[in-house]
């Protein structure tokens, strides 16, 4: 069976979106790629609405089995982190409304899966995404290439169980850190 993964590189100014079909033999094919751009001159609610509407369109058009979203990580620029977190929330909610599982991947996980090194730069990721997907030209801007890399990463890391091994609703597969967190929360609730 072919696994269809919609990758999202979330951002408030540029939100990269890429759809990839991956065969059991790991052969990946690009279905679609794009970037949703919003203007800093617009109000926050209008920017998030544009991202939400665009994601809804992509989900309805391409019907992915799973979403792969870049995990928000701490940066020095708090406003950038907030924008990424807000865009991520809109994307995750859109998937949840449709019952589509969502998997979160860190930037270093994506770099390691696509290039073999978790410290690769964006140019290396773009170059290898172009090669893996057998594209005539690199996807631009970098947000588009990153979205495709997220989709590839999820399919390759999760293997044949990629649609199941997610952090979404009904997930039976937790990372060790997620399992430890859940156990700590359960223990704290019992102690009350």
UniProtKB/Swiss-Prot annotation:
Its main location: cytoplasm. GO terms for biological process: DNA recombination; DNA repair. InterPro entries: RNaseH-like_sf, RNaseH_sf, X-over_junc_endoDNase_RuvC. Keywords: Cytoplasm, DNA damage, DNA recombination, DNA repair, DNA-binding, Endonuclease, Hydrolase, Magnesium, Metal-binding, Nuclease. It is found in: Cytoplasm. GO terms for cellular component: cytoplasm; Holliday junction resolvase complex. Its cofactor is Mg(2+). Disulfide bonds: none annotated. It comes from the Bacteria. The RuvA-RuvB-RuvC complex processes Holliday junction (HJ) DNA during genetic recombination and DNA repair. Endonuclease that resolves HJ intermediates. Cleaves cruciform DNA by making single-stranded nicks across the HJ at symmetrical positions within the homologous arms, yielding a 5'-phosphate and a 3'-hydroxyl group; requires a central core of homology in the junction. The consensus cleavage sequence is 5'-(A/T)TT(C/G)-3'. Cleavage occurs on the 3'-side of the TT dinucleotide at the point of strand exchange. Belongs to the RuvC family. This is Crossover junction endodeoxyribonuclease RuvC.
């Amino acid at each position: 069976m072919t696994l269809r993964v919609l990758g999202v590189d979330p951002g408030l100014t540029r939100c990269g979106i890429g759809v990839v079909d991956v065969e059991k033999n790991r052969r990946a094919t690009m279905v679609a790629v794009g970037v949703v751009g919003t203007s800093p001159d617009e109000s926050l609610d209008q920017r998030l609405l544009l991202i939400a509407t665009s994601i809804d369109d992509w989900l309805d058009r391409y019907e992915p089995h799973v979403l792969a979203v870049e995990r928000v990580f701490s940066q020095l620029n708090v406003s950038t982190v907030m924008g990424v977190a807000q865009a991520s929330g809109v994307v995750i909610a859109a998937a949840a409304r449709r019952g589509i599982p969502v998997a979160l991947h860190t930037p270093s996980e994506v770099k390691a899966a696509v290039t073999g090194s978790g410290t690769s730069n964006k140019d290396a990721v773009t170059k290898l995404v172009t090669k893996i997907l057998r594209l005539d030209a690199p996807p631009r801007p970098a947000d588009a290439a990153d979205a495709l890399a997220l989709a590839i990463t999820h399919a390759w890391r999760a293997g044949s169980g990629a649609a199941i091994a997610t952090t979404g609703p009904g997930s039976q597969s937790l990372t060790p850190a997620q399992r430890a967190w859940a156990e700590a929360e359960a223990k704290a609730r019992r102690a009350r």
